[in-house]
Amino acid sequence: AGLRSFPPSIEYINWLGDDDLLTTGSLDHALSVLSGNPGIALVYGGCEYIDGEGKSLWLNKSGSYAKYLMRCGPQLIPQPGSLMRRNAFEKIGGLDHQYKWAFDLDLFIRLSRVGKLQFTPRTLAKFRWHDGSLSVGGRNGSVAEASVIRTAALPIMLRAIAPLWETPIRKVILRTGEKLSLRSARAQN
């Protein structure tokens, strides 16, 4: 039944990986952004990447341009650092279960079609970067799946030439992931 079984009084949705964290006051802050702005479908903020022990590796404060970049570049909107309106989530049909890794990118692209994606400069969550996580351990699959999602979201006339930018983007995303994994390994030693 999942989210559809929630009582009607639940107006907002955030989902958090079992090893990720919200920062103190993040939900209150995100709610304050959403509450006065009915046109906003999702609010997102910064996300601190931490290793398995909780040591800081990197701070993603991608800014408001992330909502535009996600259609043609890396997905920089942090899923644990976002809060969405339930009615917007339901309007787009919820998660597309054909995706295993990049379902959040697909979700964010579809949410952007029914409402505004709003950045807040506050750090809202912490994402634990370790090989055991689905996102990190399945990095190659995740990057490939995100490429499929971005290409499908393009106008039909651009899809045939998408490999011109998708190939270098995939390489950069994979290299960035390798660097974070190295930083995480060093922090544990």
Describe the predicted segments one by one.
Residues 147, 151-189:
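Membrane-proximal basic amphipathic "stem/tether" segments
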Residues 1-139:
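Nucleotide-sugar donor-binding/catalytic module of glycosyltransferases
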Residues 108, 143-146:
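A general structural signal for well-ordered alpha-helical segments in protein cores
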